[in-house]
Structure formats: C-alpha cells, structure tokens
C-alpha cells in the first residue's frame, strides 16, 4: 500500500512488537499463528531461535511487525550470551513488548527474573499467558494476578498459540496499540527474512527433530547458493557446520540415512513455502570452534560478544 493509498483509506498504524520470554514458552509458535504462515522455526528443544526473526501481520488498517526473540536464560557460552543480548535489544527497540509466560510453569525463577528486567523497558508491556489449555482456570487467574502484582501490564491475554485460542483477540489488540504511521513493508510480505535464510532455518529445524542431546546446539546451517532454474524449480546448496568429526558422522548417519531424511523433510517444506519444486543438496563440514567465529555470528544475525 502506497502512502497515497493509505491516506485515502484513513489513518494507518504500524509498529514493532517484541515477544520475550523463557526458552520454549511458545514465542515462535505464536508468531507463526499471528502471521498465519510459517516464518520462524519451532522445536520442543529450548533455544531454537537464535536471532531476531520478524513476522509481518496486517490487521485492518494496522501493520504489526512481530519480533521473535531468542529465549532468555542464564547464558554460559559465547553464543548463549549473544542470543540473550539480542533478545533484550529487541525488547528495548520495539514499540510494544509482549511478555510470554508458560501457564504450566507459572512464575518460576526464570519467569520472575524476566519480568523484573522487563520493568526497565520503557514501552508498554502486555502479559501473554500461553498454553492455557493445560492448566485449570483457577490457577490461571492466580498466575495472572501474581504477574500483574510484580509489573503493571497494560493488557493481559490468556491464549493457546498451538490451538489458536485467544490469538485473534491478541492480534486485534496489538493492531489498536501500535502507533499511528505508514506501513514499513508491502502488504503481501510476511517476513523480512530472505528466503535463503528461512530455508537454512528449516533445515536446522529438521536437525533438531532428528538429533538429540547437545548436537543440535553445536551445529549451524548456511545456504551457500540459491539458483532459480529455467524450468521454474530452485536449486539450493546448504552446509551444515559441526565442531568435530564424530558429530559429522552422527549427522550423516549409517549409510547417509540421517542426512537423507533431514534433506527430504527440509526439501518438502521449502517447496511448500516457495510453491515450486526444490532440489536441495546438503553438505556436512567440520569447523572447529565455529561458536567463536565472528563470521558465523554475522551469518546468524547476531552481534559477536568480545568477552
């Protein structure tokens, strides 16, 4: 929508809304539910989101730019510190902040620490209690009351991002609360992430679903090439970086079975999103201490912590 078109249709609103919370609280699932399409990866494993991923929603005359931040936790590694720093910078730079709580976990130490620190964010804060379908109503009301005692939230919503309950109400409220202004993105754009980045994230999601324990956290995926062919299909080459040769063997699997399965699932999902046939080629390489390589952080959209 051009500025002239927006003026002709009445006042528009546009703003950034950061979603913050502990790992696995459901931020990425909520972003996808609000957008109505997959723009960020989801896994039951914690710390899946590493950088700021923006999903874009049109609701009436409002454009809501959702910032899916990494989960906030006590950082131990350099990568952990970069992720937590990125999450808080996303909160401070936004127009509104949604603080997500897991209804089952309630106000545990992690949630309380996040609420305490959120008090320093100057913008309006919205409390979003997720996974409400798993908890009795009496417990939910007590949780909401306790959270609002700790911090004066502008609004409170109880939702299930997975089932969609309460998501429409939250979307409408965000549309009313973002500041007046012109749209930042075209109306048909659902994310600011390039497709080659989303494709790498999808492959990383499949690694999370196939492999267990620490290995997914010690790997990263980069899209090396993205070529649109004359027949309308896309040829994609990606590299999965791991830190040790033993990890490379795990990713490959016996007779290459694991990497084939990862590739097949990733190829199918990328094709569904792009709407064209996809030829995906995966390579697994050892890059020792990639977690200390500034170039890898830039590729992931993170600031490299110097200490």
Swiss-Prot record:
Q: Where does GTP bind?
A: 21-28, 68-72, 130-133
Query: Could you describe the subunit structure of this protein?
Result: Monomer.
Q: Which CDD domains match?
A: Era, KH-II_Era
Q: Which InterPro entries match?
A: G_ERA_dom, GTP-bd, GTPase_Era-like, KH_dom-like_a/b, KH_dom_type_2, KH_sf_prok-type, P-loop_NTPase, Small_GTP-bd
**Region (G5): which ranges?**
159-161
GO BP terms, alphabetized: ribosomal small subunit assembly
The function of this protein is: An essential GTPase that binds both GDP and GTP, with rapid nucleotide exchange. Plays a role in 16S rRNA processing and 30S ribosomal subunit biogenesis and possibly also in cell cycle regulation and energy metabolism.
One Gene Ontology cellular component: plasma membrane
This entry's Gene Ontology molecular function terms read: GTP binding; GTPase activity; ribosomal small subunit binding; small ribosomal subunit rRNA binding
Q: What is its main location?
A: cytoplasm
State where the protein is found: Cytoplasm; Cell inner membrane
What taxonomic lineage is listed for the species of origin?
Bacteria, Pseudomonadati, Pseudomonadota, Alphaproteobacteria, Hyphomicrobiales
Q: Which UniProt keywords apply?
A: Cell inner membrane, Cell membrane, Cytoplasm, GTP-binding, Membrane, Nucleotide-binding, Ribosome biogenesis, RNA-binding, rRNA-binding
Keyword Zinc-finger annotated: no
Q: Which residues form the KH type-2 domain?
A: 211-288
Start and end residues of each stretch annotated as G2:
47-51
Span list, region G1: 21-28
Q: Which family does it belong to?
A: Belongs to the TRAFAC class TrmE-Era-EngA-EngB-Septin-like GTPase superfamily. Era GTPase family.
In this chain, the stretch annotated as G3 covers: 68-71
Residue ranges for the region (G4) are 130-133
Note whether RNA-binding occurs among the keywords: yes
In what way does this protein cross or attach to the membrane? Peripheral membrane protein
Domain Era-type G stretches:
13-180
UniProt-listed Pfam families: KH_2, MMR_HSR1
At the top level, the lineage of the source is Bacteria
Q: Which species is the source of this protein?
A: Bradyrhizobium sp. (strain ORS 278)
Q: What is this protein called?
A: GTPase Era
């Amino acid at each position: 929508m051009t500025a002239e078109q927006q003026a002709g249709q009445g006042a528009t609103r546009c703003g950034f809304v950061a979603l913050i919370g502990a790992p696995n609280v459901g931020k990425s699932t909520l972003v996808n539910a609000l957008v109505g399409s997959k723009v960020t990866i989801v896994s039951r494993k914690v710390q899946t989101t590493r950088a700021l991923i923006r999903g874009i929603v049109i609701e009436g005359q409002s454009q809501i730019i959702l910032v899916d931040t990494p989960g906030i936790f006590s950082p131990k590694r350099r990568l952990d510190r970069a992720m937590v720093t990125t999450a808080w910078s996303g909160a401070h730079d936004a127009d509104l902040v949604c603080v997500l709580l897991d209804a089952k976990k309630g106000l545990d130490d992690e949630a309380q620490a996040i609420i305490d620190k959120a008090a320093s964010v100057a913008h309006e804060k919205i409390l979003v209690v997720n996974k409400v379908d798993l908890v009795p109503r009496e417990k939910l009301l007590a949780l909401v009351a306790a959270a609002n005692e700790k911090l004066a939230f502008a609004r409170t919503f109880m939702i299930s991002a997975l089932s969609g309950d309460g998501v429409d109400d939250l979307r409408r409220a965000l549309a009313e609360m973002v500041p007046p202004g012109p749209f930042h993105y075209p109306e048909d754009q659902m994310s600011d992430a390039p497709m080659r980045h989303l494709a790498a994230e999808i492959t990383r999601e499949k690694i999370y679903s196939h492999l267990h324990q620490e290995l997914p956290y010690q790997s990263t995926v980069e899209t090396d090439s993205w070529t649109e062919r004359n027949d309308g299909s896309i040829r994609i080459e990606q590299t999965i970086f791991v830190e040790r040769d033993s990890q490379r063997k795990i990713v490959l699997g016996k007779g290459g079975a694991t990497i084939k399965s990862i590739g097949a699932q990733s190829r199918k999902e990328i094709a569904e999103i792009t709407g064209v046939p996809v030829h995906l080629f995966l390579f697994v390489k050892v890059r020792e201490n990639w977690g200390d390589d500034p170039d890898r952080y830039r590729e992931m959209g993170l600031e490299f912590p110097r200490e």
